[in-house]
């Protein structure tokens, strides 16, 4: 079955090496699309405006996320997290295009893919070994020969794209608060960010 919303986010952060495992403390406010709270808040409300946290507050376990019942965290709600307005004994599990939109475009997921890519590049000098690292970190298994061939082809196509679009590469690796490794060329890091995102979007990663 597909993991619950909180488990999905935490798994992506853990694979990226971003998850803050500290226990306890006040609620935190991770990334959220701008303007959502303003649409539903009363003018005098003390939760009229959403201001994301900085630093480790962006990467704590989802259980610590500040929860406004009138406007639950958008990315978690997309994966069927409840509003908490009423008791829920069992969550539904929907399957919608918005869910892929989140895992491929939400800043939390894009940043996780980039940090996972940085780990892969630092861990291995060759494309094959980087793919093996990504597979073991996300799927907990080695890749088969056909999978390696397919992913190598994908990486080459992405690399060719970013070789001629430096602006797009630079824009991609800037997503998220954590800075990109300045020692890595933006085009190469962007290439492996896309490949890492492919791993994070596999059913094998999202379902346990």
PLM features: what roles do these ranges have?
Residues 120-193:
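C-terminal structured "cap/appendage" subdomains that terminate the fold
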């Amino acid at each position: 079955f597909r993991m619950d919303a909180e488990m999905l986010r935490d798994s992506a952060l853990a694979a990226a090496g971003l998850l803050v495992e500290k226990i306890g403390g006040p609620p935190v406010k991770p990334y959220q699309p701008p303007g959502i709270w303003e649409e539903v808040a009363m003018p005098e409300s003390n939760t009229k405006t959403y201001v994301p946290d900085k630093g480790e507050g962006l990467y704590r376990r989802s259980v610590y996320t500040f929860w406004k019942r009138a406007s639950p965290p958008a990315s978690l709600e997309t994966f069927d997290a409840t509003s908490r307005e009423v008791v829920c004994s069992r969550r539904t599990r929907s399957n919608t295009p918005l869910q892929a939109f989140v895992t491929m475009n939400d800043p939390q997921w894009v940043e996780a893919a980039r940090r996972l890519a940085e780990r892969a590049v630092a861990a291995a000098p060759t494309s094959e070994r980087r793919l093996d690292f990504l597979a073991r970190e996300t799927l907990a298994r080695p890749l088969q020969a056909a999978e390696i061939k397919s992913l190598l082809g994908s990486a080459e196509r992405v690399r060719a794209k970013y070789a001629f679009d430096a602006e797009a590469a630079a824009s991609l690796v800037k997503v998220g608060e954590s800075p990109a490794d300045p020692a890595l060329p933006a085009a190469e890091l962007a290439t492996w960010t896309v490949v890492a995102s492919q791993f994070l979007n596999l059913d094998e990663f999202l379902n346990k």
